[in-house]
């Protein structure tokens, strides 16, 4: 599983499967073995997965797309967050992870997904700066959840006092215009799996 976990960083087509396999490794079952064999057969039949970057004129925008499956795990009731980061029209990062806390509402789960996506976007901007590319625009974070956008655009917790305090940094980044949160239709959200 360690090898497919390493491979899953570069192969967005197996990201969700790798997440599920990693979750099963603390207590593997026969079903876990079937999953890893199925993944092995898939990788044998699809040995090459290539992200082809065509030339684009002036790719100066970082866009983060996020989506969350609220309480998707029937055992733990934890939500799954997924996302895509694009530089211009090129996809440069994808992920699918279980959230560490149990969300009490779908808006809260989507907010936690936006926090994850925003941290990835800001990390990519910092990497670009280290490579000598200054990026002074706001990072656009797109989601299909109005409630999560409302939480991100306010200051403080308001009526959602149960949100983890360490997740509220997103509000200050929105206020300082480092991030711009926009709503996208659920059918057009490319992070929706």
What is the predicted role of each segment?
Residues 10, 28-31, 57-58, 77, ...:
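Secondary-structure capping and boundary motifs in well-ordered enzyme cores
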